[in-house]
Curated annotation (Swiss-Prot):
Its biological purpose: DNA-dependent RNA polymerase catalyzes the transcription of DNA into RNA using the four ribonucleoside triphosphates as substrates.
Organism: Vibrio campbellii (strain ATCC BAA-1116)
NCBIfam families: PRK00405.1, rpoB
Keywords: DNA-directed RNA polymerase, Nucleotidyltransferase, Transcription, Transferase
Annotated InterPro entries: DNA-dir_RNA_pol_bsu_ext_1_sf, DNA-dir_RNA_pol_bsu_external_1, DNA-dir_RNA_pol_su2, DNA-dir_RNAP_su2_dom, DNA-dir_RNAP_su2_hyb_sf, RNA_pol_bsu_bac, RNA_pol_bsu_CS, RNA_pol_bsu_protrusion
Keyword Nucleotidyltransferase included in the entry's annotation: yes
Annotated GO biological process: DNA-templated transcription
HAMAP family, A to Z: RNApol_bact_RpoB
Similarity comment: family membership: Belongs to the RNA polymerase beta chain family.
Main EC class the enzyme belongs to: transferase
Gene: rpoB
One Pfam family, short name: RNA_pol_Rpb2_6
Name of protein: DNA-directed RNA polymerase subunit beta
SUPFAM superfamilies with a match to the protein in the record: beta and beta-prime subunits of DNA dependent RNA-polymerase (SSF64484)
Length: 1342
């Protein structure tokens, strides 16, 4: 196996046995690909902005004299880069410029003669841009657009499963769902009539829609029924016989022909009878005249002599009608063939309840239903019906919808047609009737073949189209009004509606969410989230159990484990590890192809629909050397059902064991031993882990930690291979390999690192280099670790030494006992960064001022401010300290005589301003790490702002100069090489000034040309540097674009260091969560025979009932991993030679049956030394989900580390030194500190705010609220008989307003008594009763 440079530094021992056929695809591709499709210029006009423009343009004026045509669009360059946008609080976007052509036709000349053409580029607003990591910066905050799982457009056949009608009869319905436009529903009622609804309005008989399409009753019957022909012969009737139609009927007369009786009267017609009739070739039989009575005529029969109708189409035939027919000379008669079994008379019955007679009356009926109360005219009715389903502006099935529609009704043509046609409607009705007749199946709407993914690009395109349509209306009106000769395209287009639509979508759509930025995993998971909620989706209240449940088609597409607990369960899902979207938006998952019983490495992506046709073997099926299946019978899936199949039947095989689950779930080692409910909690809690101060890779992982860390974008990854030229805390410089160079560039890559910035969740984002100068790196190598990453691997928590045992009740009910050593070593210390903002506005009374001159504030309070009134960087502040001094003018008030005196003595200034400074919130203390001042254009900058500006300019200049020097150095080195080739000596060059090298000349023409090219490049480089610096300078010095009325904004960043303490929530990766109950001194913790104390004591009772046994296996394997590290440490202490280390490492990596082949011999001595250094803390292990380390391997590893195979050690009580009576399970578990910190939750209330209506105290920390004394607490006091306590709880301590004030007075006066009055909420109750019209009054007892 080939390891990259960073991977060699610490090789994970992999226990997986299945070969890796397919690497996990790039995790953010669902976001990036979708948005690229939206922005990229698509020549076909199928997707993105191009499609939106083409669907709206050309816009014609109402009078047809002119039209506005779309030519092309281009996106400009963003003004600020991503970081600047975040700092300034603006949106990261590109301007959209569209080239439009206004064509004016000549009124007087023949139609289509062009009079004038004007082209112009028009600005159409800003399009937010996706960053490289799949997020958007909107108003300075990072947001993610979550993909939506919605019902695919197309036609769906469904039934109510007998729930609608009391009889329990199953009613079938069909629904045509377009991508945009009106819904069309067909449904049966309990009397078996077929109805149609448009847009879920009131129902009409379904024949109305056929009539509206111009069909007569005869044609309608012709479409839906088979016919039976009767010939009238004297007194008998000859019936045309189709033997198959008789099957299952009871003969009501003897069936005989040619003198032979086939079926006697009263007998049932069987398959044997039918065979005999077919064999004898009987095609007509005689039937009694009574047989035809009650049959239904299929067409109109007319007496040609008189012209009157004898029998109407769809009319039942009576004996009288029969007589009239023979009299009129009709020799044959055609009736509808119906029976109760599989040819129901549904359409015939429906026509009877249909009151309309022709096309116009049908159209009018539809118009009345859609626009009740409006007088229908023929034209209006026709126009409405036409626009419902047949106009491209109003109705679009979309490519997906047409594809689904055609495959459902079995139509081959009309691939591109977005609207419906007559055939579509007829076919849907036919299929629905066939289903009612018992042929065919209803669809399963939870099948992933009927639900598709709508990603960012598609939703943005839809919003953009909405904006364009709004513009279209305005353009049409303007084209019709104005003087066209003077108008340019610019004057027609108002970009506001477009900007507004796009802004609304990115800023406030339900699916545009504030990015969960706790740690890299939460970012990745958020971007891979699939929600069924949102516009055009479900609502929590309406979603039933079926939609939320795991469906068989989720296999390998959506994770069956990771979903929120609570009201959204099952509605928000996560994409499985290998899943991807196909061009239609359906989810696909990869499978290995099986050819002639041999599993190949060819991979096919199958959607849920395609998968149904195949037999698919599981990923853990045993294979032979040749790649065939080892067992005769294998577990496989077919049509979603798992079962045993002969191995010859398998057509595909899963690609990996973690194919089924999401990224978060595949990070849980030994997932296969955990109960699903706990695994769900484990997957969800990893996303809440706070990045610790020192990241620590998990000893027991699953092998995909590197994928998550690299794909999340929090690490710095090498874009091209090369050698590290220099490294410092804020930048890494790589000299690129020759073969990866683009001709004519300097060949230097510079990576600027992010230092101590704030994330959305107030955690700290900081990158640390993990490479040294001179190290070779290749493309994709990790150069710097971000938050929660360690040597390029995801590291959410810390490896803790754990014992499972009770300890004096301190770990009762999931509490956690932690050793003081954990706090001392800062294992779970986290940095949180808060942003506090102070805004100076223009008020009616004058403008607010940021100043250090604040009235009535002592010197000590101002000690941390500079002369501008802004706190200096590095100050340690605590709750209540002033960060930014600000004064606000206050209105003139009535002055007291004392104040007047003060004014007279001290002049005017004493009290016309009030102190509105920004102070540190009460519960916070920390260090100021950054201050930013934004000043409105045209307002003079204060001293601090200018200082910051100078500093930024200096930094920018330093950065760019360094960058320039590095690039220049690279270029001059190449110049030097050319000059030496041309015959100059090294010594001469070293004495010449390097800048002068470019002026030297060479004999050789080729080399001279090269030298001249390099000189040109140097000039370009210099010009580029000047231009870049100028741009940077302009950005830094220009005023800021602030909201109206805002003069100045000061942002102060405060870093808080939080150590772990009782009340903080911690968890493992298996859903085993708990709260710290006590921090115990190290000397009191249990310790083993070597004197090593444990870090954490967990309660063993937390394991059996929760069935998450994975944690026990993790602890055992962690112990072995740490044991190997200890053994390496021992060897280092003994200073053994390198060969011994190589031998031991080879032994470790070869242990167990694994797919991983690590060849220690192929590593250089330096690489082995680095590896040893990194393994001293323990051997990192990968145990992939569903393919983890078996028990035997764990025991073998424990044995190799000289530890007991049981994984249990003798422990001693730290307080007494006595041995505990049984061995205890001790080992290493990866523990996370979750973002539920006691510091953020702790809260106490004194007198505070009250609710307006009930006058009760508010609740919650944010409102400085109280604790609710609820009904159960009231019952408790009632049960104790504590009447007076109860009285004060319900009155003076809650909502008795007068009582409250009196009590305060009494306490001040030293009189400790209370007089409870009427609680305000009782008055509210009285008012509510009165509002119901019941007069209720309180009467005093006399």
């Amino acid at each position: 196996m080939v390891y990259s440079y960073t991977e060699k530094k610490r090789i994970r021992k992999d226990f997986g046995t299945r070969p890796q056929v397919l690497d996990i695809p790039y995790l953010l591709s669902i976001q990036l690909d979708s948005f690229d499709k939206f922005i990229e210029q698509d020549p076909e006009g199928q997707y993105g902005l191009e499609a939106a423009f083409r669907s709206v343009f050309p816009i014609q004026s109402y009078n047809g004299n002119s039209e506005l045509q779309y030519v092309s669009y281009r996106l400009g360059e963003p003004v600020f880069d991503v970081k600047e946008c975040q700092i300034r609080g603006v949106t990261y976007s590109k301007p959209l410029r569209v080239k439009l052509r206004l064509v004016i036709f000549d009124k007087d000349a023949p139609a289509g003669t062009v009079k004038d053409i004007k082209e112009q580029e028009v600005y159409m607003g800003e399009i937010p841009l996706m960053t490289d990591n799949g997020t958007f910066v909107i108003n300075g905050t990072e947001r993610v657009i979550v993909s939506q799982l919605h019902r695919s457009p197309g036609v769906f056949f469904d039934s109510d499963k007998g729930k609608t009608h009391s009889s329990g009869k199953v009613l079938y319905n069909a629904r045509v769902i377009p991508y945009r436009g009106s819904w069309l529903d067909f449904e049966f009622d309990p009397k078996d009539n077929l109805y149609v609804r448009i847009d879920r309005r009131r129902k009409l008989p379904a024949s109305i829609i056929l009539r509206a399409l111009g069909k007569t009753s005869e044609e309608i019957l012709d479409i839906f029924f088979e016919k039976v022909n009767f010939e009238v012969k004297d007194q008998t009737l000859l019936m045309e016989l189709v033997p198959d139609r008789l099957r299952g009927e009871t003969a009501s007369f003897d069936i005989e022909a040619n003198g032979k009786t086939y079926v006697e009267q009263g007998r049932r017609v069987t398959a044997r009878h039918i065979r005999q009739l077919e064999k004898d070739g009987v095609d007509h039989i005689e039937v009694p005249v009574e047989y035809i009575v009650g049959k239904v005529a299929s067409k109109d029969y007319i007496n040609e002599a008189t012209g009157e109708i004898i029998v109407n189409a769809n009319q039942e035939i009576s004996l009288e009608a029969l007589a009239n027919l023979s009299q009129a000379g009709h020799k044959s008669l055609e009736t509808l063939f119906t029976n109760d079994l599989d040819h129901g008379p549904f359409m015939s019955e429906t026509l009877r309840i249909d009151s309309t007679v022709d096309r116009i009356s049908a159209l009018v009926e539809i118009y009345r239903m859609m626009r009740p109360g409006e007088p229908p005219t023929k034209e209006a009715a026709e126009a409405l019906f036409e626009s419902l389903f047949f106009s491209e502006e109003r109705y679009d099935l979309s490519t997906v919808g047409r594809m689904k529609f055609n495959s459902s009704i079995g139509r081959e043509d009309a691939q591109e047609q977005g609207t419906l046609d007559e055939l579509d409607i007829v076919e849907v009705m036919k299929k629905l009737i066939a289903i009612r007749n018992g042929k065919g199946e209803v669809d399963d709407i939870d099948h992933l073949g009927n639900r598709r993914i709508r990603s960012v690009g598609e939703m943005a395109e839809n919003q953009f189209r909405v904006g364009l349509v709004r513009v279209e209306r305005a353009v049409k009106e303007r084209l019709s009004l104005g003087d066209l000769d003077a108008i340019m395209p610019q004057d027609l287009i108002n970009a506001k509606p477009i900007s507004a639509a796009v802004k609304e979508f990115f800023g406030s759509s339900q699916l545009s969410q504030f990015m969960d930025q706790n740690n890299p995993l939460s970012e990745v998971t958020h971007k891979r989230r699939i929600s069924a909620l949102g516009p055009g989706g479900l609502t929590r209240e309406r979603a039933g159990f079926e939609v939320r449940d795991v469906h068989v088609t989720h296999y390998g597409r959506l994770c069956p484990i990771e979903t929120p607990e609570g009201p959204n369960i099952g509605l928000i899902n996560s994409l499985s590890a290998f899943a991807r979207c196909n061009e239609y938006g359906f989810l696909e998952t990869p499978y290995r192809r099986v050819v002639d019983g041999v599993v190949t490495d060819e991979v096919d992506y199958l959607s849920a629909i395609e998968e149904g046709q195949f037999v698919i073997a599981q990923a853990n099926a045993a294979l032979t050397e040749e790649g065939g299946f080892a067992d005769e019978l294998i577990t496989a899936r077919q049509k979603g059902e798992s079962g045993l199949h002969p191995r010859e039947h398998a057509q595909y095989m899963d690609v990996a064991t973690n194919q089924v689950v999401s990224i978060a779930a595949s990070l849980i080692p030994f997932l296969e031993h955990d109960d699903a409910n706990r695994a769900l909690m484990g997957a969800n809690m990893q996303r809440q882990a706070v990045p610790t101060l020192k990241a620590d890779k998990p000893l027991v992982g699953t092998g995909i930690e590197r994928n998550v860390a690299v794909d999340s974008g929090v690490t710095a990854v090498a874009k091209r291979g090369g050698v590290i030229q220099s490294v410092d805390a804020s930048r890494i410089v790589v000299k690129v390999n020759e073969e990866e160079l683009v001709p004519g560039e300097a060949g230097i890559d510079i990576y600027n690192l992010t230092k101590y910035t704030r994330s959305n969740q107030n955690t700290c984002i900081n990158q640390r280099p993990c490479v040294m100068p001179g190290e070779p790196v290749s493309r994709g190598d990790v150069l710097a670790d971000g938050p929660s990453t360690d040597l390029g691997e995801l590291a959410l928590g810390q490896n803790m030494r754990i014992a499972f045992m009770p300890w004096n009740g301190y770990n009762f009910e999931d509490s956690i006992l932690v050793s003081e050593r954990v706090v001392q070593e800062d294992r779970f210390t986290t940095i949180h960064i808060q942003e506090l903002t102070c805004v100076a506005r223009d008020t009616k009374l004058g403008s607010e001022e940021i100043t250090a001159d604040i009235p009535n504030v002592g010197e000590s309070a101002l000690s941390k401010l500079d002369e501008s009134g802004i706190v200096y960087i590095g100050a340690e502040v605590k709750g209540g300290d002033i960060l930014v001094g600000k004064v606000t003018p206050k209105g003139e008030t009535q002055l007291t005589p004392e104040e007047k005196l003060l004014r007279a003595i001290f002049g005017e200034k004493a009290s016309d301003v009030k102190d509105t400074s920004l102070r540190v919130p009460n519960s916070v203390s920390g260090t100021i790490i950054d201050v930013q001042v934004f000043t409105r254009d045209g307002v003079e900058k204060d001293k601090r702002a200018l200082e910051i500006e100078q500093m930024q300019l200096k930094e920018a200049k330093k950065d760019l100069t360094e960058e320039f020097q590095i690039l220049e150095g690279g270029l001059l080195n190449r110049v030097r090489a050319v000059l030496i080739d041309g015959g100059y000596s090294e010594a001469k060059l070293d004495t010449t000034d390097r800048k002068k090298w470019l002026e030297l000349t060479l004999e050789d023409d080729a080399l001279q040309t090269q030298l001249e090219q390099l000189a040109e490049q140097w000039d370009e480089l210099k010009a580029d540097f000047d231009k870049k610096f100028e741009t940077k300078r302009r950005k830094i010095t220009q005023g800021d674009d602030l909201a109206p009325g805002v003069l100045k904004i000061v942002k102060v960043y405060l870093a808080v260091k939080r150590r772990i303490q009782p009340g903080d929530k911690m968890a493992g990766r298996h859903g085993n969560k708990g709260v710290i109950s006590k921090i115990n001194p190290v000397e009191d913790m249990p310790y083993d025979e070597k004197g090593q104390p444990v870090d954490i004591v967990l309660n063993p009772l937390g394991v059996p009932s929760r069935m998450n046994i994975g944690q026990i296996l993790e602890v055992h394997l962690g112990l072995a991993a740490k044991g190997i590290g200890d053994k390496i440490n021992q060897m280092v202490k003994e200073q053994q030679e390198l060969a011994k280390f190589r031998e031991f490492l080879q032994k470790v990596y070869d242990l167990g049956e694994t797919r991983q082949k690590v060849d220690i011999a192929s590593l250089s001595d330096d690489e082995v030394r680095t590896l040893i250094k990194n393994l001293r803390g323990g051997l990192p292990i990968a145990t992939p989900v569903f393919d983890g380390a078996p028990e035997a391997s764990i025991k073998a590893l424990l044995k190799l580390a000289d530890l007991p195979e049981s994984g249990q050690l003798k422990l001693f009580d730290g307080r007494t030194g006595d041995q505990f009576e049984r061995p205890v399970t001790v080992g290493y578990m990866y523990m996370l500190k979750l973002n539920h910190l006691v510091d953020d939750k702790m809260h106490a209330r004194s007198t505070g705010s009250y609710s307006l209506v009930t006058q009760q105290p508010l609740g919650g920390k944010a409102q400085f609220g109280g604790q609710r004394f609820g009904e159960m607490e009231v019952w408790a006091l009632e049960a104790y008989g504590a009447a007076y306590t109860l009285q004060e709880m319900l009155t003076v301590k809650s909502d008795d307003v007068n009582g409250r004030t009196k009590m305060y007075k009494n306490i001040v006066d030293g009189n400790h008594s209370m007089e409870p009055g009427m609680p305000e909420s009782f008055n509210v109750l009285l008012k509510e009763i009165r509002s119901l019209g019941i007069n209720i009054e309180l009467e005093d007892e006399e």
